[in-house]
Design a protein with these regions (language model features):
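N-terminal leader/auxiliary helical segments
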Residues: 1-90, 96-202
Length: 202
């Protein structure tokens, strides 16, 4: 089955960039969805990164993985407000984007650039995040760190199977990771890796 395997997923900056592209093309969506996303774009963007907040995913029961399509649909149907519905649509957009990453982009890059096999999926995830630009990583930090998403987090806590951490703990870890990605030293180190790379994005 075609799945949204998180092992080969996009990073937060890429998910935000894709989310912004959707928000810029709302005329393509059904009117009811368009109206909700127009009113709650921030909630949609939070949903578009939220699927990666849960850690230790391998410990959840079979079929309750946070990157499972049925889980995404359950989050959407469990939404009790238009704000949470926007979060649910963002969550599903995340899974759709990861499906492309897992089944098209990353396998192609690994096939074409066999010398990056050791670095694998994480390398290309960070390459794409660097490619979309610091502006989208800054926006990801703004969306996740600077706003109160307790209502959405409560929905995730209710729907998602517990890993070894509560969702609130997962969110604190994820916020730290996003801050780290924006750290000047990390960007300098990965920038040097890119400067020495023979491989370009298509």
């Amino acid at each position: 089955a075609v799945g949204a395997d998180p092992v080969a997923a996009w990073g937060p900056a890429t998910h935000i960039a894709l989310g912004e592209a959707i928000l810029g093309s709302l005329y393509l969506l059904p009117p009811a969805i368009q109206a909700i996303l127009e009113r709650f774009p921030l909630h949609f963007l939070y949903g578009s990164v939220a699927a990666d907040i849960s850690f230790a995913k391998k410990y959840v029961p079979e079929g309750r993985h946070c990157h499972n399509w049925e889980i995404g649909e359950e989050i959407l149907t469990s939404a009790g407000s238009d704000r949470l519905t926007a979060v649910g649509y963002g969550y599903l957009a995340h899974l759709a984007a990861d499906t492309i990453a897992h089944n098209v982009f990353v396998p192609r890059q690994l096939l074409l650039t066999s010398t990056t096999q050791a670095l694998g999926h994480t390398y290309w995830e960070h390459r794409m995040d660097m490619h979309v630009g610091e502006g989208f990583l800054s926006l990801a930090r703004h969306v996740v760190v600077d706003h109160d998403h307790s209502e959405a987090d409560a929905l995730f806590d209710d729907v998602l199977s517990r890993t070894v951490f509560r969702f609130q703990t997962n969110r604190r870890i994820f916020r730290g990771m996003i801050r780290f990605q924006g750290h000047e030293r990390w960007q300098r180190v990965f920038g040097q890796v890119l400067a020495n790379s023979r491989f370009d994005l298509p």
